């Protein structure tokens, strides 16, 4: 596939309402002492595929902001993933086949959105592949 491919535009669509979501099938309960919040792929490059201030991205960003604030207040650690720009083709793996070159080091691509920026006690995991945890700096 071409190495010049980028992310396609994602058309607007409404988020499902609570009553449209399927019921939880697993009886899991949140254990605050074992919980963490993962804010995944909120860099300008990825979010730029959506139309700003329109659904789904506008309510998603507001929800992430609220979740992160509540997690911090509850003492739950907040982790972010951030992909490095200008990754070597061999490091991109399947991502290169599907999406081409990927993000660059530019300020238009690299930073996590200002409204969701990590706070001093948050953690940023460098993301190399689709999995946020492969070759991560998480110990």
Predicted regions and their residues:
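Active-site acidic carboxylates
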Residues: 2-119, 123
């Amino acid at each position: 596939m071409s190495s010049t491919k980028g992310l396609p535009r994602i058309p607007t669509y409404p988020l499902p309402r609570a009553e449209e979501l399927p019921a939880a099938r697993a009886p899991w309960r949140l254990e605050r002492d074992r919980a963490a919040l993962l804010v995944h792929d909120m860099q300008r490059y990825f979010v730029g595929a959506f139309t700003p201030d329109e659904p789904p991205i506008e309510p998603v960003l507001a929800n992430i902001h609220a979740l992160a604030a509540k997690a911090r207040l509850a003492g739950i650690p907040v982790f972010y993933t951030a992909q490095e720009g200008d990754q070597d083709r061999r490091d991109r793996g399947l991502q290169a086949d599907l999406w081409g070159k990927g993000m660059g080091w530019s300020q238009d691509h690299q930073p996590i959105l200002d409204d969701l920026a990590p706070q001093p006690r948050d953690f940023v995991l460098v993301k190399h592949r689709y999995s946020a945890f492969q070759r991560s700096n998480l110990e």
